[in-house]
């Protein structure tokens, strides 16, 4: 019986045994075979294509043209970073990110409770740069993606120092520093080389991303609130550049801003862009 059923299926043109070709197996069963990918496959292929970064800010144009090659040049003149691709271009290969927590949050409306997801993401290169991003969205993936972008936009420099003699590379915080968010207070104390990061799980991860090897920490308040705990740690690291030490007492020699140095480049680009727009309008 099985052989007869298989023969009947083969006679009908089917290659699946007794089931034939399914719907439309006899007439037009091969329609559209040579038309290439259709439906979701084609749409997914378009989404996977990498789009080239086209900078829209002055700083982005300078970075894309390799006029600025280090983040320190941006921090020195306090230039605002409005495009996350700038961070990717300068420290992209060494930058790591980690999702610290995803928590549901609710808002009461007339129609009922509206639930969204809040993501906390930390990024850092382990060499004196760290950022924190918080994003709320209807979907988890969208919240994580947005938090990563915000974390890159908020990357700040972390100042490192020594506990005793200045031997080797800086390994700890330069002095005692305190950060606060809500009821949570985090205090960091310099530690001798080899002590490691003496901290809870949440601040330890942030300190590792910042590139600090040895530090003593203490915290107080509602540290169970992870969001405030992370923000207090990030605030602590931000304040490492907020004080003057004897090495900064000498007279400061100011240098020109990148915008002033590359004025001709920026004006040329702007003029060429306006010419293209006007020519297109004239042709239309």
From Swiss-Prot:
Which Gene3D superfamilies does the record associate with it? 3.30.160.20, 3.30.230.10
Task: Output a single Gene Ontology CC term carried by this record.
Answer: plant-type cell wall
A Pfam family of this chain: Ribosomal_S5
Which InterPro entries does the annotation name?
Ribosomal_Su5_D2-typ_SF, Ribosomal_uS5, Ribosomal_uS5_C, Ribosomal_uS5_euk/arc, Ribosomal_uS5_N, Ribosomal_uS5_N_CS, Ribsml_uS5_D2-typ_fold_subgr
Would the keyword Ribosomal protein turn up in this protein's UniProt record?
yes
**GO molecular function annotations of the record:** mRNA binding; structural constituent of ribosome
Query: What ranges does the record list as Basic and acidic residues composition bias?
Result: 1-19
Task: Give the UniProt family note.
Answer: Belongs to the universal ribosomal protein uS5 family.
Q: What is this protein called?
A: Small ribosomal subunit protein uS5y/uS5u/uS5v
Q: Which gene encodes it?
A: RPS2B
């Amino acid at each position: 019986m099985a052989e007869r059923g298989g023969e009947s299926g083969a006679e009908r043109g089917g290659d699946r045994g007794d089931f034939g070709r399914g719907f439309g197996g006899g007439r037009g069963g091969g329609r559209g075979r040579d038309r290439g990918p259709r439906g979701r496959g084609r749409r997914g292929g378009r989404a996977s294509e990498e789009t080239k970064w086209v900078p829209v800010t002055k700083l982005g144009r300078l970075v894309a043209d390799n006029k600025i090659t280090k983040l320190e040049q941006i921090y020195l003149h306090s230039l605002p970073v409005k495009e996350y691709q700038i961070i990717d271009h300068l420290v992209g290969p060494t930058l790591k990110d980690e999702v610290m927590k995803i928590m549901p949050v609710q808002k009461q409306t007339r129609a009922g409770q509206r639930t969204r997801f809040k993501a906390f993401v930390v990024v850092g290169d382990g060499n004196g740069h760290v950022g924190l991003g918080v994003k709320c969205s209807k979907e988890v993936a969208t919240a994580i993606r947005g938090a990563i972008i915000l974390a890159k936009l908020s990357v700040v420099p972390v100042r490192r120092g020594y506990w005793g003699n200045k031997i080797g590379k800086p390994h700890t915080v330069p002095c005692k520093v305190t950060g606060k968010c809500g009821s949570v207070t985090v205090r960091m104390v310099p530690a001798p080389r080899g002590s490691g990061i003496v901290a809870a799980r949440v601040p330890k991860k942030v300190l590792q991303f910042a590139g600090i090897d040895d530090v003593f920490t203490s915290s107080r308040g509602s540290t169970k609130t992870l969001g405030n705990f992370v923000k207090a740690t990030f605030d602590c690291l931000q304040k490492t550049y907020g004080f003057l030490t004897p090495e900064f007492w000498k007279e400061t020699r100011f240098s020109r801003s990148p915008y002033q140095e590359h004025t001709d480049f920026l004006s040329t680009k702007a003029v060429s862009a306006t010419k293209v727009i006007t020519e297109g309008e004239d042709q239309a």
